[in-house]
Amino acid sequence: IIKDPLIPGGGDFATDDTLNGLYAVKITSTTADYIPDETISQTVAGGTALGQVVSWTRDVPGTVPTPSTPGSGVLKYIQSPQVHQNNGVVRAFESSAANAITGDQSNVPGTVHHDYANGTLLLGCTFNSGLASPELQNNSGDLIYIENRRLITRAPDQIEDIKLVIEF
């Protein structure tokens, strides 16, 4: 939980109940799925934009893109100055149909849907020319609660018993 985050480009506090802290790209003409945690790249003016995939959500759930039937979706990612530098600069991804965004593990090239309607809200992101920025300013606010739980592996047929004792 973050207390008093700022909105980008100003000193005003964010007042919405929920905010998206990820960058996103509306992708079209992809022939496979991007893999979470893989590095993505795009050739941009001055170098290469780099990022790390957080999630890939297909526009049509249940369909798998192939070379014969390309798909589309929303690619959410982060950019960290420690990891995603190119010649000492963290470069932004561009709204260009000419330069594909490619995953380093999946080898998936995807085209930015650069004419995606401006101001369109999809999956919690507001897109402009196929790109969406975070709704809060990076490194703003106070982190007041974090919880990291370890993964618990469960069998599909496992039954959990929960007991609650209330005394007066």
Set out the residue ranges of the language-model regions:
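Interface-prone segments of viral and bacterial extracellular assemblies
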Residues: I1-F168
